[in-house]
């Protein structure tokens, strides 16, 4: 039985071009669904896979002779990217410089972002790994300061509509979700909602900061909840490499996740989305001279 997503309910189809095949068996080795086996010294499609081909493309990508064609589940042989000419892969030092130098940017120049850069950011984001192919991430792209502001104010209007949940009389209800949730709502969500409402009344946008570009990544109910966050991270790093600043905004999705039907219909946001994140982009107004060394809450090692 095929694994269902919002985009497909079929298995991928594996076709061998045997006059190109050298029977090396690499395709069989990399297929963790066990969709492929060696039989009579050649790879064939197994009749007893784990799930059935999910069209991850691993077998097609590892084949040295282009002897495999995957189709279905939004995959085709045309999706192959030749890696033989990619000689300038990023070194660790280059990558570290990129991530250490990146700051969360909320102050932007009054400068539009070129369409070419927007396309490059999306191109990088769609290459992010996902829990199950094909990607079930949905993306809303808001181009231009005015469109970002319009979306922001629509969200802030909804914030105001549900602000009673964060009032002094009702904030206690979050105890039902646990002590940690209550403390987070009391110390963060309650003052944030009040601040955003007050500043919106003054025509100020402290939700998405009047960025010239925003992208809203959401997951479908079928996808891994982490998928939109990973895609958003790829987009953020791509933007940094292109000279743009960015910042993740996590307050939008949890607030509108279980309601805001009118808003979601207007902005083509999937109604039932378990997770989501907004990223804002723009040319940084200020340049930072230093990076910040970070740490995890804890790191535990286990070794042989």
Indicate where each model-derived feature is located.
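Acidic, surface-exposed loops and disordered segments
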Residues: 2-304
């Amino acid at each position: 039985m095929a694994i269902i997503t919002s985009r497909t309910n079929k298995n991928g189809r594996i076709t061998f071009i045997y006059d190109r095949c050298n029977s090396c068996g690499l395709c069989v080795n990399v297929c963790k669904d066990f969709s492929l086996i060696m039989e009579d010294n050649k790879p064939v499609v197994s009749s007893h896979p784990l799930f059935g081909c999910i069209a991850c493309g691993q077998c097609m990508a590892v084949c040295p002779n282009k002897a495999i064609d995957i189709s279905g589940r939004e995959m085709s042989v045309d999706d192959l990217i030749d890696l033989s000419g990619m000689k300038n892969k990023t070194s660790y030092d280059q990558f570290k410089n990129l991530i250490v130098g990146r700051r969360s940017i909320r102050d932007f120049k009054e400068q539009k972002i070129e369409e070419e850069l927007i396309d490059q950011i999306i191109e990088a984001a769609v290459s992010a790994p996902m829990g199950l192919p094909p990607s079930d991430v949905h993306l809303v792209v808001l181009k231009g300061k005015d469109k970002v502001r319009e979306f922001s104010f629509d969200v802030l209007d909804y914030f105001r509509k549900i602000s009673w949940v964060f009032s002094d009389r009702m904030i206690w209800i979050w105890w039902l979700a646990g002590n940690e949730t209550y403390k987070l709502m009391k110390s963060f969500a309650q003052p944030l909602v009040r601040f955003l409402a007050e500043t919106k009344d003054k025509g100020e946008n402290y939700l998405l900061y009047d960025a010239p570009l925003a992208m809203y990544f959401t997951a479908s109910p079928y996808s891994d909840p982490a998928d939109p966050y990973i895609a958003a991270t790829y987009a953020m790093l791509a933007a940094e490499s292109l000279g743009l600043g960015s910042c993740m905004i996590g307050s939008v999705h949890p607030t509108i996740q279980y309601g805001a039907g009118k808003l979601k219909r207007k902005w083509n946001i999937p109604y039932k989305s378990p997770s989501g994140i907004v990223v804002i982009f723009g040319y940084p107004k200020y340049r930072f001279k230093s990076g910040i060394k970070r740490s995890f809450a804890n790191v535990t090692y286990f070794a042989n």
